[in-house]
C-alpha cells in the first residue's frame, strides 16, 4: 500500500501553499497591471495574458494522458513544471517586447495550471480521507494569505516613482523556484504508480460527463461561468487602471482584485 508519512508532506506543502499564493496573485493581477501601465499593451496581448490559466486547464487532460505511462512521481513532475515556470517568468522580465513578454507568461501559466491536478494525486496517495480535507483547506488558506500579502506590498512598491516592474516578476520567479524545490523535497510514494492507459483517459474525458446528467449540467454551468470571468477580468483591471476609468493606485487595484475577483 502506498503510504508515506503524511506529516513530512504536510511540513513541505504548508510553505508551498503560501508561495503558490504569491505566484497566483502575480498572474492574476500584476502581469496584467504591468502590461497595461508599463508596456501600454495592445488588447490582443492582454487577452493572451488573461487566457493563460484557461489554456493550461484545457491542455491538462491531454498532458496527463501523455504522462500516463511515466513512472516519475507526481512531486517530481510538479517540481519540473514549477522550475520551468520560474525560468519563463525570468525570461519575461528580461524582455522589452510586449508580444514576447505575453507569450512567455502564457507558457508559464500553462506550466502552473498542471500542478493542481498532480497535487490531487499526491494528496490521495499520502493523506488519509479524514485528514485530507483539513490539510488541503489549510493549504488554500495559506495560499490566500500569500496572495493578499504579496498584493499589498508589491502594489505599494509599484506606486513608487523609482519602481521597477521587474521586481514583481522576480518575486514571482522566486516563488515558483521555491515551490519547485519544495516539490522535489516531498516524500515519494513507496509503491510503483499505476500506469494509466492513454486511450481510456481520453475516452473518459469526453464520455463520462454524458453518463451523469447532473454532473454534465454542473460542468456546463461552471464552463459558462469561467468564460464570463475570463472575458471580463482584463476589462476590470483595465477599468481600475485606465485614466479614463477609475485610475486607481497599483496598491488599490491589487487589494480590490485579490479580495473581490
Q: What are these regions, as identified by a protein language model?
A:
Residues 18, 98-115:
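Hydrophobic core of transmembrane alpha-helices in multi-pass small-molecule transporters
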Residues 60-73, 158:
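Helix-to-loop junctions at the C-terminal end of transmembrane segments
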Residues 112-141:
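Cytoplasmic helix-loop-helix junction between adjacent transmembrane helices
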Residues 1-58, 214-256:
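Helix-loop boundary and gating motifs at the non-cytosolic
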Residues 174-192:
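C-terminal membrane-cytosol helix-exit motif in multi-pass small-molecule transporters
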Residues 75-90:
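Structural signature of the two symmetry-related core transmembrane helices
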Residues 56-60, 136-152:
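Glycine-rich segments within core transmembrane alpha-helices of 12-TM secondary carriers
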Residues 187-204:
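Flexible cytoplasmic inter-helical loops of multi-pass small-molecule transporters
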Amino acid at each position: 500500500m502506498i503510504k508515506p508519512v503524511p506529516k513530512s508532506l504536510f511540513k513541505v506543502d504548508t510553505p508551498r501553499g503560501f508561495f503558490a499564493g504569491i505566484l497566483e496573485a502575480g498572474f492574476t493581477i500584476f502581469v496584467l497591471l504591468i502590461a497595461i501601465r508599463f508596456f501600454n499593451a495592445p488588447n490582443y496581448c492582454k487577452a493572451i495574458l488573461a487566457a493563460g490559466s484557461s489554456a493550461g486547464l484545457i491542455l491538462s487532460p491531454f498532458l496527463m494522458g501523455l504522462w500516463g505511462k511515466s513512472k516519475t512521481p507526481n512531486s517530481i513532475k510538479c517540481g519540473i513544471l514549477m522550475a520551468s515556470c520560474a525560468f519563463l517568468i525570468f525570461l519575461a522580465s528580461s524582455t522589452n517586447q510586449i508580444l514576447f513578454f505575453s507569450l512567455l507568461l502564457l507558457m508559464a501559466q500553462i506550466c502552473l495550471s498542471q500542478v493542481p491536478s498532480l497535487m490531487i494525486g499526491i494528496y490521495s496517495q499520502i493523506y488519509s480521507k479524514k485528514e485530507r480535507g483539513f490539510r488541503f483547506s489549510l493549504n488554500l488558506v495559506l495560499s490566500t494569505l500569500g496572495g493578499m500579502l504579496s498584493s499589498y506590498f508589491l502594489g505599494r512598491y509599484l506606486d513608487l516613482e523609482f519602481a521597477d516592474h521587474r521586481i514583481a516578476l522576480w518575486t514571482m520567479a522566486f516563488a515558483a523556484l521555491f515551490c519547485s524545490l519544495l516539490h522535489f523535497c516531498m516524500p515519494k510514494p513507496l509503491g510503483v504508480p499505476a500506469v494509466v492507459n492513454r486511450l481510456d483517459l481520453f475516452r473518459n474525458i469526453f464520455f463520462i460527463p454524458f453518463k451523469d446528467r447532473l454532473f454534465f449540467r454542473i460542468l456546463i454551468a461552471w464552463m459558462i461561468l469561467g468564460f464570463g470571468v475570463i472575458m471580463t477580468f482584463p476589462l476590470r483591471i483595465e477599468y481600475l487602471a485606465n485614466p479614463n476609468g477609475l485610475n486607481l493606485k497599483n496598491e488599490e487595484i491589487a487589494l480590490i482584485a485579490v479580495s473581490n475577483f
